[in-house]
Each structure stands twice: as structure tokens, then as C-alpha cells.
């Protein structure tokens, strides 16, 4: 068993375990009941046990010390709940050891998304919109890990882009996971040695570093380049009138530019490019700036002003109209009875 304490690896001897061989045990019970068991008498059957030997030999684990890939992203603009979710997801992955041929599922490692598992409500993408959900921000964890895995050149078997663009990595460099859509980020340790995943957060930055045994040539370097193939800029604002809310209530969601992008893997030897390979292609939805605007008022004229402002499809015009209506109402409230006559 491999652990990392204060920047140094420590190896703990594994212990042999035993697991019940369910199929063989069921057969043994059936054979006893249909064979030697005498009806009405007590009896017992020994379950069939299988030996579960610990993985990893000490001499193999002792070789794990080289940085195969590392990557850092920032969540400096995130609120407290999203920041907690990023740190929590990171801690659930930190300390993972994968032996040659092992498969790692990010979703299975960080689930369930519940308060009991350390998550809180925060913003996330769902069907091209920003919504609050338990575990919002977990995709920054999977994305950061994805980029470390790419630099370690491990085998990626499943990766999905977000429905809309994210800001913490370049287009096509993201890896979304989602319970609702079944998205996962999965990779395989395709090296001949164990690898260790170190993850930590500090100063609102998350870093994953993958350690193993470096077998790649020293004069060889790997880099990744994002290419935007198509860009779709939102045009008119989308404004929804809400008759259940009073004038002055407005909820605005930011616009998202739509992209088609590709990610390229570039290999250089002695500083000279020797190969360029497409890693993935990604499509991100365009989403206009949207607003839900309250129009309810005892003053029909104020409601009419709001409806006219909404018809312009300009959130800025709507905000200006709200300010004008409030100013009119304040001025009217300040009038004396004599002035109203």
C-alpha cells in the first residue's frame, strides 16, 4: 500500500484477505441439502473461501517517484459552497494507487453527491442552463485530473465535454461528469508500473499530480493545444415576464458563447515538433443572456412600461425602466396632500 506524507512516499505492507466465493458456496450448500443432510437434523456447511492477495510488491511500489503529469486550475471566483465541493472531490481522489491495467472511474470515486458525502449546493450546468445542484463544481475536479492524465499519457477511455464552455481551461480541455446524463471520465493505467494520484487544494487552486516510473525519453516533450473551429456569439437578450413577481425583481443569467473546438496533442523531440494528433472534438452550446423580470404592480401604467421595455429585448433597457418607475413612485410618495389636489 502506497501513501504520501509530507511530500515523501511511504510503503505499508499489505495483508492477505479472504472473500466468500458465492457461486462455489451456493453449490456446496445445495449439494449438502440434496445429499448427506438428514431432514430435521441440524447441520453446517463450510463456505468456500477465496484468497485475496494484496496488490503491489514492495520493490515495485518503491520505484514510484517520478512525476508523469501534473496540472492546476484556479477557482478563485468561486463561492464558499462551490469551493468546498472542489476540495471535497479532490480529497476523495487523493491517494489513489492504480496498478498496471487498472481502470479509474472519476464518477464512481467521488459519488454519491450528497451532504453526507461532504457536498453542498452550488452552480452547475444542466441542459444548457446554470442551476444549483448538490456537488456543483465537481467537474472542475474531473477536468483538472483529465489534464494531468493527458500529460502522463495514460489511456483515456471515456471523456465528455460540458454542455456550455467553462472558464478554467481552454475549449476541449474539459472533462464533465454528471449523474443525470451518465457522463464519466475514465482512464486506464497503461504503464508497466503502479501510479499514484496526488490531489490537493490551496489558495483556491486545485492540483493533481500523477506519480509513476518515467520511461519516456528525456528529449521528448508533450504539450496540448486548443483550436477553436467555430464561434457563435449570442445576439439579443432573452427576457421573460413574470407576473407573479413585483416590479424591481430581476434575475439575470450570463450569456455563453457557443464553440466548436478540437484538442491537439503535440510531441516534440529536442524542441522540434515530430507529431500532432487530434485528441478530441467538442461542441458547446450558445446561450443568450437571459432575465426573468417581475411586472406585477397596482399601477397599470407601470406594468405597461415594463412590458414595453421587455419588448425591446434589452436587459439594460429593462433595468433602466425599473429605475425610472422607482423614481416616479418615490416622487409620487413624497408629494404632500396639497400637491396632490
Model segments located where?
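Well-ordered beta-sheet/strand-loop patches within structured domains
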Residues: 1-341
